[in-house]
Amino acid sequence: MPQMAPLNWAMMTIMFSLSLLVSMIILYSNFNSTPPTKMKMKTSQKLIWKW
């Protein structure tokens, strides 16, 4: 099925970029948070909603 190959590749790329974005957000919130975990959760949620 040659027609399905580009679609699968696009889906894989999209999923990879999404996971990369999520991991970057998590890393960013981890590096930027000196307050306790509750605040960290709040900020990460805010970041996710912003995206």
Swiss-Prot record:
Entry keyword set: ATP synthesis, CF(0), Hydrogen ion transport, Ion transport, Membrane, Mitochondrion, Transmembrane, Transmembrane helix, Transport
GO molecular function: proton transmembrane transporter activity
Bilayer-spanning residue ranges: 7-27
Annotated gene: MT-ATP8
Location of the protein in the cell: Mitochondrion membrane
Functional summary from the UniProt entry: Mitochondrial membrane ATP synthase (F(1)F(0) ATP synthase or Complex V) produces ATP from ADP in the presence of a proton gradient across the membrane which is generated by electron transport complexes of the respiratory chain. F-type ATPases consist of two structural domains, F(1) - containing the extramembraneous catalytic core and F(0) - containing the membrane proton channel, linked together by a central stalk and a peripheral stalk. During catalysis, ATP synthesis in the catalytic domain of F(1) is coupled via a rotary mechanism of the central stalk subunits to proton translocation.
Keyword Membrane: yes
Membrane topology: Single-pass membrane protein
Primary localization class, coarse: mitochondrion
Gene Ontology process terms (BP): proton motive force-driven ATP synthesis
Keyword flag Membrane: yes
GO cellular component, one term: mitochondrial membrane
Subunit structure: F-type ATPases have 2 components, CF(1) - the catalytic core - and CF(0) - the membrane proton channel.
Protein species of origin: Limulus polyphemus (Atlantic horseshoe crab)
Family: Belongs to the ATPase protein 8 family.
Protein's UniProt name: ATP synthase protein 8
